[in-house]
Amino acid sequence: MAAHRFSSLLSRSVPLLSRGGKQSYLGRGVYRYGTAAAAALEEPIKPPVSVQYDKLLINGQFVDAASGKTFPTLDPRSGEVIAHVAEGDAEDINRAVAAARKAFDEGPWPKMPAYERQKIMLRFADLVEKHNDEVAALEAWDSGKPYEQCAQVEIPMFVRLFRYYAGWADKIHGLTIPADGPHHVQTLHEPIGVAGQIIPWNFPLVMFGWKVGPALACGNSVVLKTAEQTPLSALLVSKLFHEAGLPEGVLNIVSGFGPTAGAALCRHMDVDKLAFTGSTETGKIVLELSAKSNLKPVTLELGGKSPFIVCEDADVDKAVELAHFALFFNQGQCCCAGSRTFVHEKVYDEFVEKAKARALKRTVGDPFKAGMEQGPQVDADQFEKILKYIRSGAESGATLETGGDRLGTKGYYIQPTVFSDVKDDMLIAKDEIFGPVQTILKFKELDEVIRRANNSSYGLAAGVFTQNLDTANTMMRALRAGTVWINCFDTFDAAIPFGGYKMSGIGREKGEYSLKNYLQVKAVVTALKNPAWL
C-alpha cells in the first residue's frame, strides 16, 4: 500500500488485545480470552525459534570479541540464560569503525547509484517479511513482549520503515540558489560518513529501523551497538541484510555494555555522527563524550513523562480504554507512555473506577501464550525499579486502586497497577517509571492542566481526549511536547517525525526530517564570466 500506516496496525490490532472477553486478531488464529484478572503463570512455553547468531558482526563476518568474552542474555520469563553473546569492548569498536570507514571511503555503497541502494533495502525488507514469525519469536523471547505484538505490529513496522527509507534513497538532492553577482550557487547533500548508533532494549528492531534506515538511504556506513538486554534480533536481521546484497562493512553490529563499548563508540575520533535512544542521564554522557572528542553531531531520543489529558466532555469508556493502552502497552516500557493521566474533576471518580476495572481485566502471562496483553519486564533491574516506585507511591499518600506487587514467583512479571489521588510532587508523577503503573491526577480548569502538564523536565509526547475542537486546538499549541496526539495515542507512521522538547532529546527521527541527521550540506559557488542573463 502506498500509504500504509503504523497507526492502522496499532489502532486496529493492539486495542483488540485490550478488551476482555473479546477476540484477538493478532497471531495466526483467532483466540478468545476471558476477563479474569491476570492469567495464571505456568512454566515458560518453549519458543518456536533457536539462537543462530551470537557473535559480533564486523566487516560482513560474525566474529568473536577480541577479548574472547561473552555475556548472558536472559529470558525475562524465568531469568534463565537464552544464549551467551560476544561481549564487545573498545577494541571491537575500533575494528568495527575501521571496517565502516573503509566501506565508506573505498567501498561501493556511497558511490553506487541511489536506486541500487534502494533495491538492496527493498530486498532486505522482503526477506524480513518472509521471516516475520522467526524474527518476531526471537524478539519476544529476548525482550519479554508478547509474541503477537511482535509478529503483527512491530516486525511489520520494521519492514515498513525500510521500504519507506528505500523510497527516499533516490530523492535526496541539493538546490540551485539565486545569489547576488555573477555566480552560480548550488548545494550538495552528501552522506555524513560513519554513523555510530546506540539502540535501547524496549523496541530493539523498531529502533534499529529508525536509525539504520535513514543512515543507509543517505549512503552512510553504520556501527550499531545493541542493548545488552536484547542483542539477538539485530544479529538475526543483519544476516538477512547481507543476503539482500549489502556490501561488507556497511553495517557493523557490536553487542556489549555502555561503559565499555558504548562509550568507546561515542568518543571515537573516526565516527562522524552519533544517534542514541535511552535514558536522559545516559544521553547527557553521550553528548559530553561527543563534545570531548571530535564534536560529532548527536541525535538524542530520551526519557518522557507524557501527560494524557481527559477533558470533561470525553466519552469516559473510550477515554479509559485509550488511556489504558497509552500507559500499559509494551509493559509500560515506552518512552512516550501516557504516564500522567490527568482527568477532569467532573468525570474523575467514574474514570478511576473504570480504569481499575480495566486493569483487573488485563491479561498477563507468557509472551508465547495466545491473547496475552502483557509479558514480563525486561530484566531484574527494571523489575526492582518499578516495584520501588510502586512502594513510593503508596508511602507518599496515593491510593493504590489495584495491583502493586509482582505476579507469580518466577520471572519479572508485575501486576497492572493503578494509583488515584496522585499529586504533582509525588515521585510517581515526576519520574519516568517505565513500567505498568498508571497514575491518575485530577484537574479543574484547562489553563491549570496545561500548566501542570508542562511542568516537567520532559517534553516527548502528550495526549488529549476531547470532543471540542477549540479545546483540541488550544492544547496542541500550548503543550510543550514533540508529539501531541488528539483522541488517539501511540499513532506512528514512518513519515511522521518523532522527538522531544526539553530533556526528552535533540533532533527528530523518522520521516524526511531524519534524513537531515545523516547528510552534510555543502555550498558550491562558481564564478561566471559574461553570463548571458545576469
From Swiss-Prot:
Keywords: Mitochondrion, NAD, Oxidoreductase, Transit peptide. Expressed predominantly in the upper and lower flower petal lobes, and, at low levels, in flower tubes, pistils, stamens and sepals. Pfam families: Aldedh. Optimum pH is 8. Active in a broad range of pH varying from 6 to 9. GO terms for cellular component: mitochondrion. Pathway: Aromatic compound metabolism. It catalyses: an aldehyde + NAD(+) + H2O = a carboxylate + NADH + 2 H(+); acetaldehyde + NAD(+) + H2O = acetate + NADH + 2 H(+); benzaldehyde + NAD(+) + H2O = benzoate + NADH + 2 H(+); 2-phenylacetaldehyde + NAD(+) + H2O = 2-phenylacetate + NADH + 2 H(+). The record marks 202 as: Transition state stabilizer. The active site is at residues 301, 335. GO terms for molecular function: acetaldehyde dehydrogenase (acetylating) activity; acetaldehyde dehydrogenase (NAD+) activity; aldehyde dehydrogenase (NAD+) activity; benzaldehyde dehydrogenase (NAD+) activity; phenylacetaldehyde dehydrogenase (NAD+) activity. GO terms for biological process: circadian rhythm; green leaf volatile biosynthetic process. Induction: Circadian-regulation with peak levels occurring from the late afternoon hours until early morning and lowest levels during the afternoon in flowers. The keyword Transit peptide applies. It is found in: Mitochondrion. Its main location: mitochondrion. Inhibited by disulfiram. PANTHER family: ALDEHYDE DEHYDROGENASE-RELATED (PTHR11699). Component of the floral volatile benzenoid/phenylpropanoid (FVBP) biosynthetic pathway. Catalyzes the oxidation of benzaldehyde to benzoic acid (BA). Capable of oxidizing a broad spectrum of aliphatic aldehydes; increased carbon chain length results in a decrease in its efficiency. Homotetramer. Belongs to the aldehyde dehydrogenase family. This is Benzaldehyde dehydrogenase, mitochondrial. It comes from Antirrhinum majus.
